[in-house]
């Protein structure tokens, strides 16, 4: 597994280790609980994996184009500087649907492995150029996708740790 994704996997496992049923469902009013956060992460990994798998099956990357200025700025902030903005609304395809915590965790870990393989396969086929476009960050290399998911995951792992340590 790629080093960024392996580190992400370890951090998710550590942040969710020992969570009881009540811990999985704890959240401040109007915010996602731990189960929803982990489900969201799993859906984001699964969506990236599926995009890569479909492109590989079709024999070409999903989108090769020059990035727009706004996409470049967002990608530099997130991927290069590790700054993930707060309050960005998740797209519908990665919004949690209500899986329980252990189920969401198992799915997230499996999706992370699937995404790692799909990104490695795409990188092997298309090299170090763009392998697909993120809806807000534009065209990205496999390395940028991995770093994006690491930064995005760390953003949410912080929330997992806050909720797990707050007895409410």
Language-model segments: which ranges?
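Active-site-proximal binding-pocket segments
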Residues: 16, 23, 48
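Short, charged, low-complexity loops and linkers
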Residues: 1, 28-30, 95-97
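Short, contiguous alpha-helical
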Residues: 27-79, 120-168
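Short helix-to-loop capping/linker segments positioned immediately adjacent to catalytic or ligand/cofactor-binding
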Residues: 23-26, 102
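Catalytic-site beta-strand/loop segments enriched in glycine and acidic/polar residues
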Residues: 12, 18
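Extreme N-terminal tail/first-helix region
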Residues: 1-11
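Acidic/histidine-rich alpha-helical segments that form the ligand environment
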Residues: 8, 73-128
